[in-house]
């Protein structure tokens, strides 16, 4: 703190992120520095917690929701401008106070590359990617196991679910010990790229969470055909045009089965996701949104 205070005229901007971290420093910065404060929230934590409470009904989650709602709006009022990775958070914040300076930015950027024309007849199985320190990913595997995979196996016993993600819980491990699951756990970037190339469909059956999902953007950048929920697709403009979206377990299983052997549609979805990445998720597109804040 002393270094910042003693050099307060040397900094034009201070970039804070994550509410539980930013709240420790923002008052000090405001009181002792002249820098413009930019806050990046990643997602609205209270939205995610509210959805978890609505689904699970846990009183501790309700307490956390109220705590983070107060915390996050305190930061929004104290920052000069706040960034979030999708328009959904901006809409939610503007409902509370339209005067708050908040922007949806591109949190993910890629170099433009040639479109991959994948031969889906040479692929197999379905892929889930998500770290299991994050509760919504554990819930997604639970929902898959209880309500989706049995419907798939009843129609096509050859389809396996490949599960990628660090720190799998005991529940996830036990589920994956049953037939039809292949638990990879943590994998290297190269191995993950191979899995994107080798599997037929990427699924993200998220029932709660908030904000744009990195796992979805990553799958799009790798030319995946994607099936997800409205929560999984949240914040991605025009998502229904290049991925399958449903919140119903029976329909989710049906979408997998319907798409699995439709190589033409798989290819079309793959091409469209890559076009969206090349058009929207570039350094130039990101800079155009924020450049005025750094003048």
Each predicted region: which residue ranges?
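Conserved catalytic-core segment of nucleotide-activated headgroup transferases in glycan assembly
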Residues: 77-78, 83, 88, 95-99, ...
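Short hydrophobic beta-strand element within catalytic cores of glycosyltransferases
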Residues: 215-219, 225-228
């Amino acid at each position: 703190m002393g270094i910042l205070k003693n050099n307060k005229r040397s900094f034009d901007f201070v970039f804070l992120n994550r509410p539980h971290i930013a709240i420790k420093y923002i008052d000090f910065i405001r009181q002792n520095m002249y820098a413009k404060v930019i806050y990046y929230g990643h997602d609205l934590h209270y939205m995610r917690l509210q959805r978890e409470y609505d689904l699970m009904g846990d009183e501790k989650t309700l307490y956390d929701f109220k705590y983070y709602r107060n915390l996050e709006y305190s930061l929004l009022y104290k920052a000069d401008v706040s960034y979030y990775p999708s328009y959904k958070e901006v809409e939610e914040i503007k409902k509370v106070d339209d005067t708050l300076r908040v922007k949806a930015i591109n949190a993910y950027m890629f170099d433009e590359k040639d479109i991959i024309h994948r031969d889906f007849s040479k692929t197999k199985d379905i892929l889930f990617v998500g770290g299991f320190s994050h509760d919504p990913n554990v819930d997604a595997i639970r929902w898959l196991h209880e309500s989706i995979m049995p419907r798939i196996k009843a129609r096509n016993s050859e389809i396996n679910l490949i599960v990628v993600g660090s720190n799998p819980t005991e529940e996830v491990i036990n589920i994956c010990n049953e037939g039809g699951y292949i638990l990879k756990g943590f994998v290297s970037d190269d191995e993950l790229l191979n899995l994107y190339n080798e599997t037929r469909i990427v699924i993200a059956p998220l029932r709660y969470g908030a904000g744009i999902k990195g796992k979805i953007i990553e799958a799009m950048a790798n030319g995946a055909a994607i099936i997800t929920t409205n929560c999984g697709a949240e914040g991605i403009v025009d998502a229904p045009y290049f991925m399958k979206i449903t919140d119903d377990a029976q329909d989710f299983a049906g979408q997998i089965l319907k798409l699995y052997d439709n190589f033409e549609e798989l290819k079309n979805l793959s091409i469209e996701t890559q076009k969206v990445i090349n058009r929207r998720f570039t350094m130039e597109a990101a800079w155009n949104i924020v450049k005025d804040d750094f003048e």
